[in-house]
């Protein structure tokens, strides 16, 4: 028998069921802060009691993500087209003690599972294997604060539209259009100040617009980015919407203060008074106001100040002359801003240079792994100088080396000197040297995507060292063992700027044998050979090969003349993922760099442009001459 109570319970259950279903199909929401919001947090992401969403803090190599609790239906069930949407959010990026990094992205993805994704430039969304894969079906709008040259970043403060990878299909320096002045005004993403973003997609016109402005400014009439694109192939099902941010060796805190989203309509506007506040910056101490000084005390205070100042001046002069005399005894001066470590600090960090800490030994010195602090791992290179002149020359270069900062170079933190030995303190790069990946079987086989990225990274590093309009810094020893790979397999060129040292057999330019002088041209020659080694997976000289294959350069040249350059490609590379156009580009560029005539070799800026596809290679006939 059906009772009133059973009917009531049924109605309550159906109401609850309908509310659950409708919440799962939610297509419009407005969040002033995220306390109690329908939000899923992953990684380092968290919500403050104030409602402020923090994706990452200033710790290194973090990934933080936050997604709306239920997927959003972005495909039109009545047609093959996707639906229109509009969203707006307010974010802020505050940098740590160093440079800001790496940025955040608004993400639309079919999945919230990003296991295997890399931090830093990959924003916690992709890795080197799946970057650019059309099966990802991911749209991301990136707000990038670190320039990755190998990913075609235009600068270290830009906004980009990313489709299935972190190489933007459209990007622009961060700015907003000022309607009163009728011009774009630059906007610093990592200023620590709130920035509002509007992202709108019109499915009918297949147009995606991205607009941004400071929080206290109205929405500009002209977007920063407008891209005509049909997203129906991407939004073929329900997708998750949210945010992803990451840090690398440089770090920032990434915050989101509010978020509005709507399908087939305009996003709701914010009430700025309801937004959570950002954390206070570290307090700066200001001196307390001095109490008034009586007239009677002024003369006594003045005399006291004179006496103290005179005493301090005398003491300072004594200290300066004592230090000068002490340094004169050794006739070696450490100049500039390079950090000097005590020998005890370096010894403690490496366990007294214990053999268990030994990373490797080369002609140029021995490398040790060390730990300065729980989170600061270092690599220490010990160089024993045979003459005073050698030590003086090396020390003179330390200051110049320490000032060089580029993401594809291994950073020099500082140095230590004791007796005949110099200890160079570098950042630790975890995956070791490139030669172990190319020539040994104890490491995974590098994919073609990895290799091409590594080649472009080395090119960017050499271009930076060689410089433009300034005195170049010659590497002098470009080879696979001097290229280190970080956690994301990015190339980090090391062992640069330490005197004139010749490359190993096979990498030595012909003129170097006669003159003994390293130049930009000899670096270019060595890099050309290294490019071929990376593609072919073998060393420049292999005496056990057939006579026509002993020299890698000659072997590649034979393939070029036969019209079959791909024959020399490393057979371990998965052919399904091989991009023949890129392989040919690298091998031809390598032959051009390995020209026997230094005048015929390109400069590194041209080499980099060849690899980026922004400058065409010379005609093929030109490559035959002089190789």
UniProtKB/Swiss-Prot annotation:
CDD domains: lectin_legume_LecRK_Arcelin_ConA. The keyword Nucleotide-binding applies. Residues 278-292 have a biased composition (Pro residues). The keyword Transmembrane helix applies. Residues 353-623 form the Protein kinase domain. It comes from the Eukaryota. It is a single-pass type I membrane protein. InterPro entries: ConA-like_dom_sf (IPR013320), Kinase-like_dom_sf (IPR011009), L-type_Lectin-RKs (IPR050528), Legume_lectin_dom (IPR001220), Prot_kinase_dom (IPR000719), Ser-Thr/Tyr_kinase_cat_dom (IPR001245). The chain crosses the membrane at residues 304-324. GO terms for molecular function: ATP binding; carbohydrate binding; protein kinase activity. Keywords: ATP-binding, Cell membrane, Glycoprotein, Lectin, Membrane, Nucleotide-binding, Receptor, Signal, Transmembrane, Transmembrane helix. GO terms for biological process: defense response to other organism. It is found in: Cell membrane. Residues 26-262 are annotated as: Legume-lectin like. Residues 24-303 are extracellular. Residues 272-297 are annotated as: Disordered. Gene3D superfamilies: 2.60.120.200, Phosphorylase Kinase, domain 1, Transferase(Phosphotransferase) domain 1. GO terms for cellular component: plasma membrane. Residues 1-23 form the signal peptide. Residues 325-627 are cytoplasmic. Glycans are attached at residues 57, 78, 127, 184, 202, 209, 230, 300. Pfam families: Lectin_legB, PK_Tyr_Ser-Thr. ATP binds at residues 359-367, 381. The protein kinase domain is predicted to be catalytically inactive. In the C-terminal section; belongs to the protein kinase superfamily. Ser/Thr protein kinase family. This is Probable inactive L-type lectin-domain containing receptor kinase III.1. The lineage of its organism: Eukaryota, Viridiplantae, Streptophyta, Embryophyta, Tracheophyta. The gene is LECRK31.
């Amino acid at each position: 028998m059906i009772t009133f109570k059973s009917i009531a319970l049924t109605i309550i259950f159906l109401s609850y069921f309908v509310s659950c279903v409708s919440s799962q199909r939610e297509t419009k929401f407005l969040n002033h802060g995220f306390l109690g919001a329908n939000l899923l947090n992953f990684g380092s992401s968290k919500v403050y009691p104030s409602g402020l969403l923090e994706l990452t803090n200033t710790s290194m190599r973090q990934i933080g993500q936050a997604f709306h609790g239920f997927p959003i239906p972005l495909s039109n069930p009545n047609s093959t087209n996707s639906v229109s949407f509009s969203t707006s959010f307010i974010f802020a990026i505050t940098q740590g003690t160093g440079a800001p990094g790496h940025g955040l992205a608004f993400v639309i993805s079919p999945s919230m599972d990003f296991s295997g994704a890399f931090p830093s430039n990959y924003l916690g969304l992709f890795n080197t294997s799946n970057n650019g894969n059309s099966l990802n079906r991911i749209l991301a709008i990136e707000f990038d604060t670190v320039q990755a040259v190998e990913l075609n970043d235009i600068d270290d403060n830009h906004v980009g539209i990313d489709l299935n990878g972190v190489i933007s299909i459209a990007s622009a320096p961060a700015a907003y259009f000022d309607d009163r002045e009728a011009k774009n005004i630059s906007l610093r993403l990592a200023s620590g100040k709130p920035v509002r973003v509007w992202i709108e997609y019109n499915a009918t016109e297949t147009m995606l617009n991205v607009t941004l402005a400071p929080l206290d400014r109205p929405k500009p009439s002209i977007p920063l980015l407008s891209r005509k694109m049909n997203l129906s192939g991407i939004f073929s099902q329900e997708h998750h919407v949210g945010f992803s941010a990451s840090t690398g060796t440089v770090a920032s805190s990434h915050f989101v203060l509010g978020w509005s989203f709507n399908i087939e309509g305009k996003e709701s506007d914010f009430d700025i008074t309801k937004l959570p506040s950002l954390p206070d910056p570290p307090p700066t101490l200001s001196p307390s106001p001095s109490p008034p000084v009586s007239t009677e005390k002024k003369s006594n205070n003045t005399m006291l100040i004179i006496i103290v100042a005179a005493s301090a001046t005398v003491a300072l002069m004594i200290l300066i002359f004592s230090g000068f005399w002490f340094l004169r005894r050794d006739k070696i001066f450490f100049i500039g801003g390079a950090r000097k470590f005590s020998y005890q600090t370096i010894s403690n960090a490496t366990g007294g240079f214990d053999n268990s800490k030994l990373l490797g030994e080369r002609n140029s010195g021995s490398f040790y792994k060390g730990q300065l602090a729980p989170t600061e791992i270092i690599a220490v290179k010990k160089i024993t100088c045979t003459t005073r002149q050698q030590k003086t020359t090396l020390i003179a270069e330390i200051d110049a080396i320490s000032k060089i900062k580029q993401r594809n170079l291994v950073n020099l933190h500082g140095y230590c000197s004791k007796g005949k030995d110099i200890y160079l303190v570098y950042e630790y790069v975890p995956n070791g040297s490139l030669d172990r990946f190319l020539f040994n079987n104890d490491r995974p086989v590098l994919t073609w995507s990895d290799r091409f990225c590594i080649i472009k990274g080395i090119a960017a590093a050499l271009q930076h060292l060689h410089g433009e309009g300034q005195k170049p810094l010659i590497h002098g020893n470009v080879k696979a063992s001097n290229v280190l790979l970080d956690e994301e397999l990015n190339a980090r060129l090391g062992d640069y700027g330490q005197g004139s040292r010749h490359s190993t057999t096979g990498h030595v330019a012909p003129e170097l044998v006669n003159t003994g002088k390293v130049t930009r041209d000899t670096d270019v020659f060595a890099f050309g050979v290294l490019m071929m080694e990376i593609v072919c997976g073998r060393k420049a000289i292999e005496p056990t090969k057939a006579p026509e294959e002993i020299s890698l350069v000659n072997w590649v040249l034979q393939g070029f003349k036969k019209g079959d350059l791909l024959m020399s490609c490393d057979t371990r590379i998965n052919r399904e993922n091989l991009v023949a156009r890129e392989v040919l580009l690298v091998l031809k560029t390598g032959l051009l760099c390995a020209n026997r005539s230094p005048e015929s070799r390109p400069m590194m800026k041209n080499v980099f442009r060849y690899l980026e596809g922004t400058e065409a290679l010379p005609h093929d006939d030109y490559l035959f001459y002089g190789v």
